[in-house]
Amino acid sequence: MSRVDDLLNELRTHLRAAVSYSTASKANDVYEGFLFSLVVATARKSGAAVHYKDRVGNKTHSLLFRTSPGRLWSTKHNYTYAVVEFGTAPALEVHVGVYVQGSSGVQHECDVLVLDADEAALCRSERTSPRAAKCLLAIECKYYAAYVPLNQARGFAGLSMDMGNRDHSLFVANVGSGSVTKYLNRQKIARELHAVPGAPEIEGVQSLIREAFKAHVGRSDSNLRI
């Protein structure tokens, strides 16, 4: 079984839905979908209600994901996303491959983005990119055959800084790199390398995602345990 097959099996199990990826899909695209599925799985495990919607707001169980960065509000294709609801806390949305506007006003590509659902609705109506201050978590997903180039970590550090809070950022890759580890440690950016199906690092990824959810819920529903 190929590594793409492993990723597909895992994400289908987590999402409980049909997906647009196949064995012919590029590994880096499927890896983004895999991280999306980990966000969904972590939300469910933490007690959230999760469902999926298409670009016009219809519920669906057939998921279409971007394979290149795009605008959250784009109507070019019927891209789908997840809606996550924890009790009375404001609803969240989870998207793959969208641009986010940093505090500097610069647009950044975000592989997997978790943001306030109200902000996402505003973006669709006003045709604007999500504001960093309204984003809960930005996940960088890197899939390489041998090692992660250092420039990828440097680029993400710039995004993380422009998000305004490095606790909102997570760097994830399927392989390791000593230089990337040292760099991200110095920058105080959360990271999990060697994160592939079956690896212990997956627990680390899900733990970091859960902490983001806990922070979100704690701001509005302190009695809700997740």
Listing of model-derived features with the role each one plays in the protein:
Residues A24-H77:
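Nuclease catalytic cores
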Residues R12-A24:
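A short, surface-exposed helix-loop junction/capping segment
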Residues V39, C110-S125, A132-V148, F156:
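Conserved catalytic cores of phosphodiester-cleaving nucleases, focusing on short active-site segments
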